[in-house]
Design a protein with these regions (language model features):
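Sequence/fold signature of self-assembling virion shell proteins
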Residues: 2-27, 31-50, 62-81, 91, ...
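Alpha-helical scaffold segments that mediate packing/assembly in large oligomeric complexes
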Residues: 86-153, 275-284
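Residue-level signal for threonine
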Residues: 85, 162, 269
Length: 284
């Protein structure tokens, strides 16, 4: 007869797996709330680079038209639906209904960032190539390209970076130089540029640094990072925002959770986006 009877205890509070749950990018672009319809039109207006003129020989001042560009953002419907039977909810460890709600919301938030990243990746102002090592000089090249295109270097600039590019920057003296930063690097939660699954607040060289775990080419010799102005990208979403209903089907005895949203993104000003291609394989 055994003299011990071991017991196994299962922790009821679940531990969230490592994945992105929040959108990091929607606050960095121009947003629009759509009341009704499947399209949102963003108007970009400028003078077209016009120069001042003098009065003509006929005594009249030459007139011109403004440069007005309407950019159409097409909204699509996006969903994520999780369903579990009553027995699975009853027999499984942890709060399965809470897990369903958490994961569906995360899926839609990742889709928001994916839409914005796809539009950024369509920019034609490019720097670097496969095998290019990330440097401060490369970043400054991007800054100059924006300045040459008359993009204001104001509080609306974002550097959306691969983890490896940030790793290279952090090894440079410029990263912690007081001339570049307005807070001490690594000083508490607000003093880090590393990804924290929530909107970033760290600024370097007067631009918002956003390290993102889901950018194109991650871990390869052709990683993509982006330097852009807020008005270069638009993102439209229905006024109701993200719907996250939950429910229970009595006839079939299953619980469900759904996240749904009508949304889309659009590149508005190509000159306001610089695409970096660099080698991050050494840190993959």
């Amino acid at each position: 007869m055994a003299d011990t009877a071991f017991q196994t205890q299962y922790r009821q509070e679940f531990i969230a797996g490592f994945e992105q749950h929040q959108s990091l990018l929607r606050e960095t672009v121009t947003t629009e709330a759509v009341i009704k319809g499947n399209q949102a039109v963003f108007l970009v207006a400028d003078s077209g680079g016009a120069a001042a003129v003098t009065r003509g020989v006929n005594g009249l001042i030459p007139a011109r038209a403004d440069n007005l560009t309407q950019n159409t953002c097409v909204l699509g419907e996006w969903h994520d639906l999780v369903r579990k039977t009553g027995f699975n909810v009853f027999a499984s460890q942890g709060s399965q209904r809470q897990i369903m709600q958490m994961t569906t919301t995360a899926v839609l938030n990742r889709k928001v960032d994916s839409q914005i990243t796809t539009e950024l990746n369509g920019g034609t102002v490019t720097i670097g190539a496969a095998g290019t090592i990330p440097t401060v000089s490369l970043f400054q090249n991007g800054r100059v390209k924006l300045s040459n295109a008359s993009v204001p270097w104001d509080s609306n600039i974002t550097f959306l970076t691969q983890p490896s590019y940030l790793a290279y920057l952090e090894q440079t003296p410029e990263f912690s130089n007081a001339q570049y930063v307005d807070m001490r690097p690594y000083n508490g939660d607000g003093g880090t540029a590393s990804w924290r699954d929530k909107p970033q607040a760290y600024r370097w060289r007067n631009c918002l640094l956003v390290e993102h775990p889901n950018l194109p080419g991650k871990g390869t010799t052709s990683e993509k990072s982006f330097l852009f102005h807020k008005t270069a990208i638009g993102h439209a979403m229905d006024t109701g925002g993200m719907a996250t209903p939950v429910g229970y089907n009595e006839e079939q005895d299953y619980s469900w959770a759904r996240a749904s949203c009508f949304m889309g993104a659009k590149l508005l000003q190509n000159s306001g986006v610089v695409v970096f291609t660099t080698d991050g394989s050494a840190y993959a």
